[in-house]
Amino acid sequence: MSDLVKVTLPDGSQKEAPRGTPVIDFVKGQIGPGLAKAAYFARLDGEPVDLSRAIERDARLEIVTTRNPEALEVARHDAAHVMASVVQKLYPGTQVTIGPAIEDGFYYDFARETPFTPEDLERIEKATNEAIKADLPFVRSEISMEAALALFEGMGERYKVEIVKDIAAKGAKTLTLYKHGDWVDFCLGPHGPSTGRIGVVKLLNVAGAYWRGDAKNAMLQRIYGTAFFDKKELDAHLAKLEEVKKRDHRRLGPQLGLFTFHEFAPGAPFWLPAGTVLYNVLEDAMRRLVLKNGYQEVKTPLLFNKRLWETSGHWGKYRENMFLVVDSESDPALPLEDRCSFSLKPMNCPSHHLIYRMDKRSYRELPVRYFTTDALHRNEASGSLGGLTRVRQFEQDDAHIYLREEQVTDEVLRIFELMKVVYGAFGLGFEATFSTRPEQRIGDDALWDRAEALLRKSLDATGLKWTLNAGDGAFYGPKIDMLVTDSLGRKWQTCTIQLDYAAPERFDLTFVGEDNKEHRPVVIHRAIYGSFERFVAILVEHYAGAFPAWLAPVQARVVTVSDRFEAWAREAGEALQARGWRVEVDASSDKLGAKIRNAQLAKIPFTLVVGEKEVEAKGVSPRRHGGEDLKTMPLETFAELMAREATAPF
């Protein structure tokens, strides 16, 4: 064996180095000190590794610098380790569990009887940043599972012991440890060279979290934080977080009279008058769009016998997420679960399959497109509920399309065109992910191979860039998920396009082909908004509650300078209402400034001032939300303005 290894760089060039050379030494000696200084971790043949990793074989080498967002993700994981070490030093007896990097930050879960206070958080943050400045190296090692178990048992870390045992049960023989100073944790890595490279850390908040996400387990304390290489970047991020707080739909929704919740119906929103208008505008717009694009609207029952869910596979794969209903005619002596032979529907697809199956179908009819906005119920864990983004009762702009296999690509392209119309109307950017077969699934591998290949081909045909999300498909088929980007640059999952070969088999769905023989259709499951509830949450935060005129619950409010002008104010308001616009009149005794301010706080797109000159001109003086005053104009001119700006774009 040669004592030299060949290292291939991203530009295709090759360099030689002594076998066993650490990556960082290779970079310093063969590339240059500038790259070595900027390097945070590396990839050897695509595998993320520490800069201290020895190059033992011919390999492709990529250096990841602090300019790469992936380096910041690793630095945040580094920060989680440092914070955990600080917590255990400041609060002896605290048990550590897990601490990953997450989007925009990191967290670590701790087991401690006494809750962390805001003062504790400040103390931990200060000590964490001091520990970072100590610039301690991260040192990687590997030990046997037996040694790892003995190590963490000796440390009294019962949660770590539990994880080690689980890893060993899966067949692992060794465990990777990372140590900085005298603190050690097991971790796949990679980590940065030393704590001093992390940058600056800010701790954000403390929240409760069940061990392993199970409400039956102990409640832990989760400390959230973030880290940036540069303080200016941190300050900009914190300013963004403040803006996010201001836009939080859980605050703005009730404030604007859109929705609320009640303890008697956890996870089920109450839509207030303004919110109901908003909801209906969204629903009506989508209905118009799909009906003129070949869809047929259907409605199906809310409650179904379990035989439907056994046929679809939900009873075996999804039952824990369903609301089960006791059959009143069942034997009371039976166990409760055996008496539950009905369920509220968590999905529309099985009932749509029943409709499709009611008639004999010809290939000439396909695609058959069913659309609905029926209510759905899913038994989400109480701890996961949050505003409108995670609820138990919701509606979707749900559609199921029955078609021949050769029609799939064209149909996916049609769906993408609808999606572009919808997201474009809201000014939302978008990108796609492709999710493949999960561990829990129905159908054989050959069927999944076929479905994944076809959906991948269809996604490629759109020309849209996409990323792979392996193992996250639905239990019955692969899917395309759309991530929309809001005005703050945040990404939200909305649209889904799922390809299903299994349902036609399970429900015996057929069509008569050109050969006069029966064939199986393919089913596409698709939604563009996703759930209305989640989409409303996105829009509230995207617009900060200041909806465009076509979407706003109240599009214009007429305000009087004094009660002398009430008659014309009401006449103008009624004339606009007669044209279909959503208009209110404020003829209260409040001063004009207060009326205008109230309209601005309510985020109404147009405030129409009516005083003496407006009465004389039979007009109004519009003021846009945000402060732009338009000149006094005849009422008819304003109605034309409304027609341009307040008409639904789809």
From Swiss-Prot:
It is found in: Cytoplasm. It holds the Pfam family tRNA-synt_2b. This is Threonine--tRNA ligase. Homodimer. It comes from Anaeromyxobacter dehalogenans (strain 2CP-1 / ATCC BAA-258). Its cofactor is Zn(2+). The gene is thrS. One of its GO terms (cellular component) is cytoplasm. Catalyzes the attachment of threonine to tRNA(Thr) in a two-step reaction: L-threonine is first activated by ATP to form Thr-AMP and then transferred to the acceptor end of tRNA(Thr). Also edits incorrectly charged L-seryl-tRNA(Thr). SMART domains: tRNA_SAD (SM00863). Its EC number is 6.1.1.3. GO terms for molecular function: ATP binding; metal ion binding; threonine-tRNA ligase activity; tRNA binding. It is an enzyme of class 6 (ligase).
